[in-house]
Each structure stands twice: as structure tokens, then as C-alpha cells.
Amino acid sequence: MENRYATSPEDVKRYTTDKLRQEFLVESLFTPGEIQMVYTHFDRTVIGGAIPMKEPLALDAGDFLKTDYFLERREVGIINIGPKGKVIVDGDEYTLNKRDCLYIGLGKRDVSFHSEDSSNPARFYFVSALAHHEYPTKVLPIEEAVPTKLGSDAESNNRTIYKYIHSEGIQSCQLMMGMTLLEPNNMWNTMPAHIHDRRNEVYLYFDMEDDSRVFHFMGQPHETRHLVVKNEQAVISPPWSIHSGVGTANYTFIWAMAGENYTFTDMEFIKMEDLR
């Protein structure tokens, strides 16, 4: 598990491009036959990717978390971004097609990832946060998630938001998780920008062609920077940072948050004239 410490906005505004990427961009989450994880000290969030092949992959704490098992003090949200697979939780099987979500609560000991077809394996993305109470394990197919339409073609941000884990959906301690799909010929997300100083956020960009890129904007509103992001790469967004992007083509991204105020609408919008 890779370890990344929290950062100050005063320090970040002096970072080079390489340093920005080192601190905030997760370039490699998906390796066939392995689980890759990154621990960020922003709200103690763990970001991970798993591609099970012929053998299942077990989610364990390793040496880093200093617990007997991964979910001893945590909860986790999982979304499959690839072909059909399943997750087995303490003996119970949960099938996930592409874009389906599974929430697993505090205290579940044995969690493993499986692909239905090892020649065309599932690609599981997960985000974990600290937990203080056990909520039930629940799967939510994308067909059962309530879509919210936002934006317009004129603004190049016509998109659909699916909220999976939130106060009016799958219940959790603090984790919030969902997905945004942009329509063809629409490239902007989260503009006008916002911040939520009580919660960090992580974006995973996917459904992109190999030669497509997203220019992800970050930093304080008056001190913005950008990261150039490829398919299936994640961005760690500190609580003090905006998180917005524009692509060379349309894309999909998964957003996940942890921290205080378990409310999707708890955010402070930034006026366009205040962005620099």
C-alpha cells in the first residue's frame, strides 16, 4: 500500500508539475492479478483497484493498517468498471456488472474479488473510509440508482449523476460515492467549481480512449493548477481544493468523499470571476 501524506495549500502552490503528479495523481491502480492501494492522510481514505484473473484476490489489511483485517475499523464502496464479476463477503456472493456498486460495512472479515471470465476480467475500483458503526452490506445496480440530469449541450457539460452511497441511498458512516457520465461531445465536469472544506474527494476517470486526456483543475480558487490525466487514473482532491476537469472527449468518472457533513449538497460554489 502506497502512503501519501496530507499537504498544505501554501506548499502546493510552489510545486512543480512532477511534484503535483507525485502527490495527487494515482497513475497505476489496475494491474492484472493484483490489488493496488493508496492510503491518503486526507480523511484517512484508501483508494484501490483489483483485477482478479483465474484466482480470486483477497482484500486484506497487510502491514500498513495495523489491524487484523481490512474492515476491522473501516467501510468500503466498490464499483465494477469492467466486465462481470463478483465479490464474496463472509461467504455471501454479490454479482457486479459494469457500473454496479457494492457497499460493505464495518466488521466484515473476509472479502474477495472474482472475475466471471479470466480472459476478460472484471475491474473493481474501491474507496474505503474509517467507520464507527456497522451498516448492512448492500449492492445497487446502476439500473436501480436514481439518475440526476445536469448541464446542457450549450455548456458542454450535459451529464447524468448516479448517487450510490449517500444520505438518501445506501447508508454508511461517512463514505459517499457515485458516478457521473458525460454525454457524447460534452467534456466539462464540475464547472462552476466548488469546494467542501469539511470533506476530501477522490475522482477516478475512465471510459476514455488511449489517446484521450482529461485536464483536471485543482488548487485554491485563486491559485489553480492542473493535472493531465489518462484513462483509469485517479486524482486525490484535498478539502481546500477545487476539483473540475475538461476532456479531449467525453468520459465517465467516479467520485467518492469522506469527512464531515454527510450531505451531498454541502459545498461552497466559486464564482467564475474568482477563479485564477
From Swiss-Prot:
GO terms of biological process kind: D-galacturonate catabolic process; D-glucuronate catabolic process; pectin catabolic process
Pfam families according to UniProt: KduI (PF04962)
InterPro entries linked to this entry: KduI, KduI/IolB_isomerase, KduI_N, RmlC-like_jellyroll, RmlC_Cupin_sf
EC numbers: 5.3.1.17
Keyword Acetylation found: no
SUPFAM superfamilies: RmlC-like cupins (SSF51182)
Cofactor detail note: Binds 1 zinc ion per subunit.
UniProt binding sites for Zn(2+): 194, 196, 201, 243
UniProt entry keywords in alphabetical sequence: Isomerase, Metal-binding, Zinc
GO molecular function, one term: 4-deoxy-L-threo-5-hexosulose-uronate ketol-isomerase activity
Pathway: Glycan metabolism; pectin degradation; 2-dehydro-3-deoxy-D-gluconate from pectin: step 4/5
Cofactor names: Zn(2+)
Catalysed reactions, semicolon-separated: 5-dehydro-4-deoxy-D-glucuronate = 3-deoxy-D-glycero-2,5-hexodiulosonate
Keyword Metal-binding: yes
Similarity comment text for this entry: Belongs to the KduI family.
PANTHER family reported for this sequence: 4-DEOXY-L-THREO-5-HEXOSULOSE-URONATE KETOL-ISOMERASE
Function text: Catalyzes the isomerization of 5-dehydro-4-deoxy-D-glucuronate to 3-deoxy-D-glycero-2,5-hexodiulosonate.
Protein name stated in the entry: 4-deoxy-L-threo-5-hexosulose-uronate ketol-isomerase
